[in-house]
Regions:
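Intrinsically disordered, low-structural-confidence terminal and linker regions
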Residues: 1-6
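Active-site region of the double-stranded beta-helix
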Residues: 14-120, 140-154
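Loop/turn positions that initiate beta-strands
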Residues: 122-124
């Protein structure tokens, strides 16, 4: 029997994922300004807001899953906590799972009628996101918020 190494390794101490086919994207304040009600005059445009690690599989079968990690910095913009870009999924059948790895924050959820609610995130909490809900993360603490994510490829 052939034994191989895992394609991906999540480094829990460093808050990152290493390995094959890992895409890393960075969101700076300049790219995130539209997420906030007011601009943060004292915040440089190149301030790192969050990093996303995505583990891609090599095929596009509908049943396949993506795995990722979002690492949010403890940054405030004009007294608003750091947030990710909120979004609806194109396919409402695509649910998602979030697992809070480190830190504290909120998972904001909104239905198609604009009704909102939030779930507290803390280390070890597991959150199911219905595919029909828009969602975004909020880092409410003074340390990094690290959230593992699993969602369908489509």
């Amino acid at each position: 029997m052939k034994i191989t190494e895992a394609k991906w390794i999540e480094d829990f101490k460093e808050g990152k994922i290493n390995g094959e086919t890992v895409e890393v994207s960075y969101k700076t304040y300049e790219q995130a300004k539209s997420f906030y009600a007011k601009e943060g005059a004292s915040l440089p445009d190149n301030t790192l807001m969050y990093t996303v690690y995505t583990c891609h599989t090599r095929n596009d079968h509908t049943q396949n899953l993506n795995w990722g990690l979002t690492v949010m910095e403890p940054v405030c913009v004009a007294q608003e906590c750091n947030v990710t870009r909120g979004h609806f999924h194109e396919d409402e059948q695509c649910d998602e799972i979030y697992v809070c790895q480190k830190g504290e924050g909120l998972l904001l959820l909104m239905d198609e009628k604009g009704q909102c609610h939030a779930e507290k995130m803390r280390e070890g909490s597991i959150h199911h996101i219905d595919g029909a809900f828009a969602h975004r993360l909020v880092n409410t603490s003074d340390s990094k918020l690290e959230v593992m994510c699993c969602w369908p490829i489509n």
